[in-house]
A protein has these predicted regions:
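Acidic, low-complexity, intrinsically disordered interaction modules
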Residues: 14-177
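Intrinsically disordered, low-complexity regions enriched in polar/acidic and amide residues
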Residues: 9, 39, 43, 60, ...
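Short, extreme N-terminal segment that most often corresponds to the first beta-strand
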Residues: 1-31, 183-189
């Protein structure tokens, strides 16, 4: 068994700035026999088009394996796209102070300040101004923190602490033959 890289680019619609796409990348695990079958079909039919080589009919289990891998990859790519879209556009409603406190306790957020930087015209400490600065620093930190997490950890964090939820039902995708297998077919020709 070997893993083969697969990729997708999905058109999700049009926004005011043009087309919206989600890109995905994953792997599919195939046996040597399955790889040989794909290579032979490509060489016999002279095409890499899954429909034209009639893979779904002639080798339904192999097709089902590729179909599942492409479906799961496409679904994940679309899910992550909309999850980040919601975050970037402020769609999720959560208690800012509660999240900040959690991140101070559990995630390493720390706001260090000098009281002299937050004095009002009378020389008194301006707690409100310091609060704004802390909130701004937190959101910058949070953005960096989230973008540094794995997809699974982002999904978990946003779901548990930001009430983020995305519904991805019907995913459009195309089943293809992994590029490395296509290259093998060309090399052996």
């Amino acid at each position: 068994m070997a893993e083969y890289k697969i990729e997708c680019e999905q058109f999700l619609g049009i926004s005011h700035s043009g087309g919206v796409y989600a890109n995905g990348e994953s792997t599919v695990e195939l046996t040597d026999e399955e790889v040989t079958t794909l290579v032979q079909l490509i060489r016999q039919k002279g095409t890499t088009d899954v429909d034209k080589i009639d893979l779904e009919t002639t080798h339904p289990q192999l097709y089902a394996k590729l179909d599942k891998a492409y479906h799961d990859m496409a679904r994940h790519a679309e899910y992550m796209h909309w999850l980040w879209e919601g975050y970037d556009n402020g769609y999720y409603e959560y208690d800012d102070d509660e999240l900040m406190e959690y991140c101070e306790r559990e995630c390493g957020f720390f706001f260090e300040y000098d009281e002299n930087d937050y004095l009002d015209a009378n020389g008194d400490f301006d707690e409100e101004e310091m609060g704004y600065a802390k909130s701004k620093a937190f959101h910058e930190w949070l953005d960096d923190y989230l973008r540094g997490l794995s997809d699974d950890d982002v999904v978990k964090f946003m779901g548990e602490h930001m009430d983020a939820a995305v519904d991805v039902d019907d995913v459009e995708y195309t089943v293809s033959i992994p590029e490395d297998i296509i290259q093998k077919a060309k090399e052996q020709a």
